[in-house]
Amino acid sequence: MTVLEIDLLDETKNLLDEDKQLVENILQFAAEYLKIEQGTELSLTFTTNEGIREINREYRDKDQATDVISFALEEMGDGETEIDWGEFDLETPRMLGDIIISTEKAEEQAKDYGHTKARELGFLAVHGLLHLLGYDHMEPDEEKVMFGLQKEVLDAYGLER
C-alpha cells in the first residue's frame, strides 16, 4: 500500500535506481509503521555536499555540508500565525515538507560506520521523516525518543547496522 506521495528529485544524477527505490520503500514502510495518513505528501531531494552546504548556510547559518536537512511545513516559525486548517472544507492532502540528503555525505558516513551506502540513505531518510513529524534531538530526552523510534522503524524494516 502506498501511504506517501513522494516527489523525488536526484540533483546528482548519479544515484542508482535501486538506491532510490530502497529509500522510497523505507519511507513507505515508515509511514505505515507510524500510522501516517494515506495520501500525505513530501519531497525528497538528493544533492551533493556543495548543494546541501549552500542550503545549510542560507537557512541554518552553518557554512558546512551535512548529511540531511528537513524543512517541516507544519512546524511554526518565529512570528508565524498558526492556521487551523480544520475550519476549512479542503480536500487537499497533508504536506509534511522537504527532506534533502547529501549522497556524498551518505557515502562518507557509510564508509566511516562500515555499512552500505543504501543503509545510510535509508537511515537518513527515516531521520528526515521523523523531523518532518516534529521529532528532534536537541535535548537528551528528545534524542532518546527520536533515536529510539528511528531504530525501531529501521529494525522493523530489517535495515540494521
Curated annotation (Swiss-Prot):
Zn(2+) binds at H127, H131, H137. GO terms for cellular component: cytoplasm. The lineage of its organism: Bacteria, Bacillati, Bacillota, Bacilli, Bacillales. Its main location: cytoplasm. Binds 1 zinc ion. Single strand-specific metallo-endoribonuclease involved in late-stage 70S ribosome quality control and in maturation of the 3' terminus of the 16S rRNA. This is Endoribonuclease YbeY. The gene is ybeY. InterPro entries: MetalPrtase_cat_dom_sf_prd (IPR023091), YbeY (IPR002036), YbeY_CS (IPR020549). It is found in: Cytoplasm. Pfam families: YbeY. Its EC number is 3.1.-.-. One of its GO terms (biological process) is rRNA processing. Keywords: Cytoplasm, Endonuclease, Hydrolase, Metal-binding, Nuclease, Ribosome biogenesis, rRNA processing, Zinc. PROSITE patterns: UPF0054 (PS01306). GO terms for molecular function: metalloendopeptidase activity; RNA endonuclease activity; zinc ion binding. Belongs to the endoribonuclease YbeY family. PANTHER family: ENDORIBONUCLEASE YBEY, CHLOROPLASTIC (PTHR46986:SF1). Its cofactor is Zn(2+). It comes from the Bacteria.
